[in-house]
Design a protein with these regions (language model features):
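Short, Lys/Arg-rich, polar N-terminal cytosolic tail immediately upstream
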Residues: 1-9
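A short amphipathic helical element positioned immediately N-terminal to and/or at the very start
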Residues: 4, 50-59
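Membrane-water interface segments at the C-terminal ends of transmembrane alpha-helices
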Residues: 10-44, 62-146, 151-152, 156-176, ...
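Glycine-rich helix-loop "coupling/hinge" segments at transmembrane-helix boundaries
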Residues: 43-47, 225-252
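Transmembrane helix boundary and interhelical loop/hinge segments in multi-pass membrane proteins
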Residues: 48-51, 128-129, 175-185, 194-196, ...
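Glycine/proline-centered hinge or cleavage motifs at structural transition points of membrane proteins
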Residues: 190-191, 204
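Short cytosolic juxtamembrane segments of multi-pass membrane proteins
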Residues: 278-289
């Protein structure tokens, strides 16, 4: 009897310790997701009913398809530029250049600063009367006028790169630091020059780190909200489109917004599934000390 009570009391204690986390999970994640799914199939403005019209309306609308394409353009473009920036920067910082600790700290700054504050700062920097255009018009002779960066697709990609490239940079630096230097030395002894060691040894071995950072950057950029909301102008990706459907009409189009949210989630899950399948099939190799 004592052992029975002791065994079940431990289970009860474990359950009560997990109960707050379970309540938070069901209340803050599971229930809202379930409600979103239900609303996405409910006719707009009705309490009951079932329809695919919310999905069909958005996907059949050229503006809806453009929003999806724009979201992919911003996410893919910012991911590519983040990789192009992160790999050389990681290689430089790996060499322990003077002040490398400070530079590593600066890499993490975009992760610390809230996206809204960062976007406002970038709007001021790239603005018509911002420091960037002030420098161009004052010191670059062939520039006759300010360049328009804000409220453009190119400007949004620049904003995304500044905010999200630390994901790629941190994972790439981590892969480089875990790389066994003996492998590079063996390549050099075999007659390979520095470029060949980098091209045929280092880059293939750090590919998993680059891919991991890339998927983090892509997912963050794909779901970005605050930055395109204030810096996107007429360019509205999926997250902003969802907000527009809820906030601008009175009453809000909750069913349409829920359908767009489900489409957005399905695209993210689909991309993540393709990425995981690519990794399982040997999309990258790694080496560690």
């Amino acid at each position: 009897m004592t052992s029975f009570w002791h065994r079940h009391s431990r289970h009860a204690i474990t359950f009560f310790l997990l109960l707050p986390a379970l309540l938070c999970f069901f209340g803050l994640f599971f229930y809202p997701m379930l409600l979103t799914v239900v609303l996405s199939f409910r006719p707009e403005g009705q309490e009951v009913g079932w329809t695919l019209g919310n999905y069909a309306k958005f996907l059949a609308d050229p503006d809806g398809r453009w929003v999806i394409l724009l979201t992919f353009i911003l996410a893919v473009g910012s991911t590519l530029f983040s990789v192009l920036l992160s790999v050389p920067l990681s290689l430089i910082l790996r060499a322990k250049v003077r002040g490398h600790r400070f530079y590593r700290l600066m890499v993490l700054v975009p992760l610390v600063i809230p996206g809204l504050i960062g976007a406002l700062g970038l709007l001021l920097f790239w603005g018509i009367r911002g420091w960037f255009n002030l420098f161009l018009t004052q010191f670059v002779p062939f520039v006759t006028g300010p360049l328009r960066v804000n409220y453009t697709i190119q400007g949004l990609i620049l904003f995304y790169v500044w905010l999200y490239f630390p994901y790629t940079c941190v994972t790439t630096m981590s892969s480089l630091e875990s790389l066994d230097s003996a492998i590079e030395e063996a390549g050099a002894v075999s007659g390979a020059n520095r470029w060949q060691v980098l091209r045929y040894i280092v880059l293939p071995l750090i590919t998993p780190g680059i891919l991991a950072g890339s998927i983090l950057t892509f997912m963050a950029a794909f779901g970005a909200f605050s930055v395109p909301l204030i810096a996107g102008g007429d360019y509205r990706p999926l997250a902003v489109e969802i907000y527009k459907e809820i906030s601008i009409p009175i009453p809000g189009h909750w069913s349409s917004a829920s359908a767009i949210a489900m489409i957005m989630g399905a695209l993210q899950v689909g991309f993540l599934t393709l990425y995981m399948r690519f990794v399982r099939r040997g999309g990258g190799t790694g080496g560690a000390r």
